[in-house]
């Protein structure tokens, strides 16, 4: 019985680190609830699919400049968020990179929309997979 209690406690503590995995439709609905126009949802869901497989807790491998990419949209810590190791960042989204790794994607969505407004869709290297005809998200609503 003690083992079972310890196991349940360990799993409960580990659960936040596991992150959330969205589906295309659950991400589209969540982003729409956060104010993203329906007309942009096919592009955003495509980017999330190719950047993180819809997972919120992904930290990408180290880039050639020593930076990393965080969260469902793989937002770069050199320009957009402050890494926890104190490394220099322009931190244009004014948040910690850890805030991009939570199940609550509001920070990720706000920051990603800022990136898009400043740099366009091509800020994401995976845009090449998303710039053509995409499946409708109408079946998600």
From Swiss-Prot:
Show which residues constitute the signal peptide: 1-19
Please state how the activity of this protein depends on pH: Active at acidic pHs. Inactive above pH 7.
GO molecular function term, any single one = lysozyme activity
Q: Which reaction does it catalyse?
A: Hydrolysis of (1->4)-beta-linkages between N-acetylmuramic acid and N-acetyl-D-glucosamine residues in a peptidoglycan and between N-acetyl-D-glucosamine residues in chitodextrins
Q: Which cysteines are joined by disulfide bonds?
A: 25-140, 46-130, 81-97, 93-111
Query: Matching InterPro entries, A to Z?
Result: Glyco_hydro_22, Glyco_hydro_22_CS, Glyco_hydro_22_lys, Lysozyme-like_dom_sf
The EC number of this protein is 3.2.1.17
Q: Which PROSITE patterns match?
A: GLYCOSYL_HYDROL_F22_1 (PS00128), GLYCOSYL_HYDROL_F22_2 (PS51348)
Q: Which SUPFAM superfamilies match?
A: Lysozyme-like
- Xref: Gene3D superfamilies: 1.10.530.10
Q: Which residues are glycosylated?
A: 65, 104
Keywords attached to this Swiss-Prot or TrEMBL record, sorted alphabetically, are:
Disulfide bond, Glycoprotein, Glycosidase, Hydrolase, Signal
Highest taxon of source: Eukaryota
Q: C-type lysozyme domain location, by residue?
A: 20-141
Active site (UniProt): 51, 69
Q: Does the keyword Lipid metabolism apply?
A: no
- This protein's record includes keyword Disulfide bond: yes
Q: What does this protein do?
A: May not function as a self-defense protein, but as a digestive enzyme, probably in the gut of the insect body. Inactive towards Micrococcus luteus. Active toward glycol chitin.
Q: Which family does it belong to?
A: Belongs to the glycosyl hydrolase 22 family.
Protein name per its UniProtKB record: Lysozyme 1
Which source organism does the UniProt entry give? Musca domestica (House fly)
């Amino acid at each position: 019985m003690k083992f079972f209690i310890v196991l349940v406690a360990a799993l409960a503590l580990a659960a936040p680190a596991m992150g959330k995995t969205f589906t295309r439709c659950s991400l589209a609905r969540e982003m729409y609830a956060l104010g993203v126009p329906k007309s942009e949802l096919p592009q955003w869901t495509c980017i999330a699919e190719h950047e993180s497989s819809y997972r919120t807790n992904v930290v990408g491998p180290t880039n050639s400049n020593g930076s990393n990419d965080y969260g469902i949209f793989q937002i770069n810590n050199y320009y957009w968020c402050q890494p926890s190791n104190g490394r220099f960042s322009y931190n244009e989204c004014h948040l910690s990179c850890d805030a991009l790794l939570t199940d609550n994607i509001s920070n990720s969505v706000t920051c990603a929309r800022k990136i898009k407004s400043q740099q366009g869709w091509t800020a994401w290297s995976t845009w090449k997979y998303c710039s053509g005809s995409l499946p409708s998200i109408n079946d998600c609503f």
